[in-house]
């Protein structure tokens, strides 16, 4: 197609369509003029619709008029467009991805490759372009890009493609919570690579640091830098270490604000910043589709990387930040590179791996995990050189949220980032000096290994948890001895190689003594912040995560019901929290002597008796016909008593004369009252029921009467029918 890069929306929701797409994505008849509500060509006159009223067989549910539909859809679209997120925020959240197109029209258009309407870097022979030519190309490519977008939007009807895009966007959004922010500096490019610039960039491995790399002599000098532009928001990248047995999920680190390096014109190759901090991370595969091009992926991918994507890219103005792997605006950390002989062949991007939530398990030797690289690097040194000459490359500060472009820079230099300290702690078994400002407990749990574990690890033995099996004795057993149990409890813990763990920490030993899991309390504040951010634009969920959703039904509820349910769930949650606290207190109350044991026993006994006292009594159950009477004779006697009482009442009924005398019944003179024989009006007597033989006899008699005695008109005789029994 064209040379412009397409911005492809991963979310099919119209609220997230970018500026360029909104103009052309809506067809003119449906949503081009939303507020106006002009009728479409299909809308009919008034009189045909009047005719429908007088057809009673067509009085079904009236179809909503096209005019009304158009107006309502237009209003919805207008409202969605008014609350639409800006483009750079969508790119930062990963809902927009930039797809560079193949230059298929290379013969017709000889313009330089563009990215979002801006010229990209060109090969070394075009270094004399002026700024006006760049602007002209930019304008021309903008219009060309819009035309291409119109064609693409018309063609984008393939459902499977949209499904894959949605899946990728969900994976990306789930990975946004735990991601590592890394800012990249342009790689030092030797002059010999100018011939390869039309090919896709080699994805180099992120290796443990070897040394601070100086600029090679073949790099061309940088021009005089123009004034810096506004810094686009930093992008987040998640690093996963793929190993056969374990997965390391690096904690969420976002690079802090720092000064933006000067922009470089498109026709020049930027020189290398000589003194920069090397990034000591383990070799990683990038999970989301927003992968930097530096990462090597051995798997053969599903879609190939298009050409004309270069390692260096000029910085963009802030409204449209280029969401690309090698943006020069994202500088500050230089990746330690390999020699030109070690640079792998350009590989295609691997399909996105779904995020895994695993216990962070690390290895003793960090070099083990780099087995899939072209050449295994030596183990990383314990200290990372921090140059004093480069003020730009301040280490990123650990934050729980990516800073916005308007965030103020921190007043004091931020501490060392967490992943660097983890790397140091893994490489050097010795104690690391704790962070003065941070949480002491979390730091000690992360970086200070118990000495007996270090000795065990140095000895080369594999540490396993001691398992003791001891029969449990209950107070009901015959050989239960209180004094013996108390002595067992008072006796100190046996000297094992287990380190002393804090009572509620989640630190455990998983096959390897150098594993340290961060306890609950250390990460509580950041997790609360993340919860607040994630719940800010959704409904409040008062339920616990581990709670069963059995009572949740799919029945749509009214507004009042949902309000009442919200209050009820809040009250229930508070009740459950109190119950949990109580149960924790009860669990913690263990008995150490006989008095305490008696107290616990009495407590349980009172709770049980209270429960039993709330049970209904046998009398109540008998009254409610749940519990039957003791035996059949008593029940028969009760029944006969009830019968006798009722018959006495019926036998004492007053006669009509009595009622007339007592002026309860008043008859007029002309009403005759005769005494009739009293009979039982109840119809459930067996002698009142007709047997099948009786019914057959009645039918036979009736049919005989019809056939012989009943008069039938001659013309209707053909319609008569006599049923034989």
From Swiss-Prot:
The keyword Cytoplasm applies. Residues 55-64 have a biased composition (Basic residues). Residues 212-221, 265-276, 292-313, 385-401 have a biased composition (Low complexity). It is found in: Cytoplasm; Cell projection, Lamellipodium. RPEL repeats lie at residues 75-100, 606-631, 644-669. GO terms for cellular component: cytoplasm; lamellipodium. Residues 1-597 are annotated as: Disordered. GO terms for molecular function: actin binding; protein phosphatase 1 binding; protein phosphatase activator activity. PROSITE patterns: RPEL. GO terms for biological process: actin cytoskeleton organization; closure of optic fissure; enteric nervous system development; negative regulation of integrin-mediated signaling pathway; neural crest cell migration; neural tube closure; positive regulation of catalytic activity; regulation of cell cycle. Residues 1-12, 166-177, 359-368 have a biased composition (Polar residues). Residues 65-100, 124-147, 155-164, 497-510, 567-585 have a biased composition (Basic and acidic residues). Keywords: Actin-binding, Cell projection, Cytoplasm, Developmental protein, Neurogenesis, Repeat. It comes from the Eukaryota. Disulfide bonds: none annotated. Binds ppp1ca and actin. Regulator of protein phosphatase 1 (PP1) required for neural tube and optic fissure closure, and enteric neural crest cell (ENCCs) migration during development. Acts as an activator of PP1. During neural tube closure, localizes to the ventral neural tube and activates PP1, leading to down-regulate cell proliferation within cranial neural tissue and the neural retina. Also acts as a regulator of migration of enteric neural crest cells (ENCCs) by activating PP1, leading to repression of the integrin signaling through the rho/rock pathway. This is Phosphatase and actin regulator 4A.
């Amino acid at each position: 197609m064209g040379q412009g890069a397409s911005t492809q929306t991963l979310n099919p929701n119209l609220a997230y369509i970018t500026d360029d797409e909104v103009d052309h994505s809506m067809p003119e008849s449906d949503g081009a003029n939303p507020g106006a509500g002009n009728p479409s060509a299909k809308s009919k006159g008034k009189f045909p619709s009047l005719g429908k009223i007088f057809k009673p067989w067509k009085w079904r549910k009236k179809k909503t008029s096209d005019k009304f539909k158009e107006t309502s859809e237009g209003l919805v679209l207008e409202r969605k467009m008014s609350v639409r997120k800006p483009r750079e925020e969508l790119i930062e959240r990963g809902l927009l991805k930039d797809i560079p197109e193949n230059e298929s029209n290379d013969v017709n258009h000889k313009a330089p490759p563009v990215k979002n309407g801006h010229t990209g870097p060109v090969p070394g022979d075009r270094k004399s372009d002026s700024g006006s030519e760049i602007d002209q190309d930019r304008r021309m490519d903008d219009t060309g890009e819009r035309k291409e977008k119109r064609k693409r939007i018309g063609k984008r009807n393939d459902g499977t493609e949209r499904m894959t895009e949605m899946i990728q966007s969900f994976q990306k959004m789930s990975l946004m919570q735990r991601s590592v922010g890394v800012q990249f500096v342009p790689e030092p490019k030797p002059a010999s690579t100018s011939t390869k610039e039309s090919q896709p960039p080699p994805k180099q491995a992120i290796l443990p640091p070897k040394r601070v790399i100086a600029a090679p002599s073949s790099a061309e000098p940088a021009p005089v830098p123009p004034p810096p532009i506004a810094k686009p928001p930093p992008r987040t990248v998640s690093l996963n270490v793929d190993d056969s047995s374990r997965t390391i999920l690096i904690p969420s680190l976002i690079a802090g604000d720092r000064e933006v390096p000067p922009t470089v014109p498109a026709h020049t190759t930027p020189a290398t910043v000589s003194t920069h901090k090397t990034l000591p991370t383990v070799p990683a595969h990038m999970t989301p589709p927003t992968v930097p091009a530096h990462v090597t992926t051995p798997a053969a991918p599903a879609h190939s990387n298009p050409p004309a994507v270069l390692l260096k890219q000029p910085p963009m103005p802030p409204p449209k930040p280029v969401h690309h792997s090698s943006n020069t605006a994202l500088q500050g950390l230089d990746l330690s590179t390999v020699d030109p002989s070690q640079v792998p062949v350009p590989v295609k991007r691997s399909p996105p791996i779904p995020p895994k939530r695993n216990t962070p398990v690390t290895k003793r030797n960090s070099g083990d995990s780099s087995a899939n690289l072209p050449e295994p690097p030596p183990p990383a040194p314990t200290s990372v050189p921090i140059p004093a000459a480069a003020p730009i490359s301040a280490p990123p500060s650990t934050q729980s949220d990516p800073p916005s472009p308007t965030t103020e820079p921190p007043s004091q230099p931020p501490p060392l980032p967490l992943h660097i300290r983890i790397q140091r702690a893994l490489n050097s078994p010795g104690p690391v000096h704790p962070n003065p400002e941070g949480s002491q407990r979390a730091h000690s749990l992360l970086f200070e290994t118990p000495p007996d574990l270090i000795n065990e690890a140095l000895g080369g033995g594999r540490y396993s948890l001691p398992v003791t099996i001891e029969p449990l004795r209950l107070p009901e057993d015959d050989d239960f001895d209180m004094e013996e149990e108390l002595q067992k409890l008072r006796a100190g813990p046996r000297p094992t190689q287990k380190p002393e763990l804090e009572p509620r920490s989640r630190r455990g030993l998983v096959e390897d003594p150098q594993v340290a899991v961060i306890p609950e309390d250390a990460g509580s504040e950041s997790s609360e912040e993340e919860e607040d951010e994630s719940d800010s634009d959704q409904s409040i969920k008062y339920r616990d995560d581990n709670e069963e959703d059995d009572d949740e039904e799919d029945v749509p509820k009214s507004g009042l019901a949902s309000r009442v349910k919200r209050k009820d769930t809040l009250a229930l949650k508070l009740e459950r929290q109190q119950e949990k606290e109580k149960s924790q207190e009860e669990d913690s109350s263990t008995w150490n002597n006989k008095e305490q044991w008696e107290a616990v026993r009495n407590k349980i006994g009172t709770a049980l008796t209270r429960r039993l006292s709330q049970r209904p009594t046998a009398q109540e159950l008998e009254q409610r016909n749940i519990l039957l009477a003791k035996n059949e004779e008593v029940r028969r006697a009760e029944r006969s008593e009830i019968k006798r009482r009722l018959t006495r009442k019926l036998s004492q009924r007053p006669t009509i004369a009595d009622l007339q005398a007592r002026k309860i019944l008043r008859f007029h003179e002309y009403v005759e009252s005769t005494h009739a024989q009293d009979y039982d009006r109840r119809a459930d007597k067996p002698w009142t029921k007709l047997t099948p033989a009786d019914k057959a006899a009645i039918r036979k008699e009736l049919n005989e009467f019809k056939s012989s005695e009943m008069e039938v008109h001659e013309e209707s005789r053909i319609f008569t029918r006599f049923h034989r029994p």
